[in-house]
Design a protein with these regions (language model features):
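Active-site His/acidic residue clusters
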Residues: 1-10, 28-52, 88-103, 176-177
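A surface-exposed, glycine/aromatic-enriched loop/edge motif typical of exported proteins
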Residues: 3, 7-14, 101-124
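Extracytoplasmic/secreted proteins, especially bacterial periplasmic and envelope-associated proteins
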Residues: 6, 10, 14, 48, ...
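Generic, well-ordered alpha-helical scaffold segments in large soluble proteins
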Residues: 14, 18, 56-59, 63-74, ...
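Extended, charge-rich helix/loop segments that form flexible
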Residues: 17-38, 118-135
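Metal-dependent active-site segment of extracytoplasmic phospho-/sulfohydrolases and closely related
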Residues: 26-28, 59-96, 127-131
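Aromatic-residue-lined binding/catalytic grooves and analogous aromatic/hydrophobic interfacial grooves
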Residues: 58-61, 68-71, 85, 99-102, ...
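Substrate-binding rim/cap in mid-to-C-terminal beta-strand-loop elements of soluble/periplasmic
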Residues: 68-69, 109-190
Length: 190
């Protein structure tokens, strides 16, 4: 993997090339809690975390494609608006507030299932070298990759900076020009 530094620069350049980000908007500095990629001691594990996240996003993308295909099949696509959005910027929540580093233990939360529907114990937390992505795991990609996801903005969910509050809002439907871009602000309170 090229790591988060190279990928942030590449993503910023791509966003500018696509016209999604004005060329005058500079890439924000790397988050102060995120080391330079070459100083990351657990590169292989960090790469695995991003691979799992990428697979999840690919699954989301395929699921949206499936919805569109069904709407086409039922001849309802021309009568449907599809909204895709998030309620905040990327989440830095790995082990909340660096729980593992501070306390030496993983997440301890009521929202994390204790077992899979099949009864297998769920491994919670983002322990270094613990595999995530399987049905019996509950993990995330943490602040280091959230910093990449929020390119070009600073900070992330829980912050009032653009990285915390700017989020994608994609709409598909009748009378909406394909590949069009609007700069109209949209606000939703969750």
């Amino acid at each position: 993997s090229a790591g988060w530094d190279a990928l942030r620069a590449q993503r910023h350049a791509n966003l500018v090339d696509l016209g999604l980000v004005d060329k005058g908007i500079k890439l924000s500095p790397r988050d102060e809690q995120v080391p330079a990629w070459e100083k990351e001691p657990n590169q292989a594990w960090q790469q695995h975390r991003m691979e799992v996240y990428t697979a999840m996003m690919s699954h989301v993308d395929q699921s949206i494609t499936n919805v569109i295909d069904v709407l086409k099949e039922k001849k309802q696509l021309d009568n449907t608006y599809i909204f895709f959005l998030s309620d905040n910027g990327a989440s830095p929540e790995g082990h909340l507030n660096n729980t593992v580093e501070r306390l030496g233990s993983p997440w301890n939360s009521a929202v994390i299932p204790k077992n899979t529907p099949q009864g297998k114990k769920v491994t919670a937390g983002d322990w270094v070298n613990t595999s995530i992505g399987a049905p019996d795991s509950y993990g995330s990609y943490g602040i280091k990759w959230a910093n990449l996801s929020n390119t070009p903005f600073r900070n992330h969910k829980t912050w009032m900076h653009e990285g915390g509050i700017a989020a994608p809002f994609i709409v598909m439907g009748p009378k909406i020009a394909e590949n069009s871009l609007s700069h109209q602000p949209v606000h939703i309170i969750d």
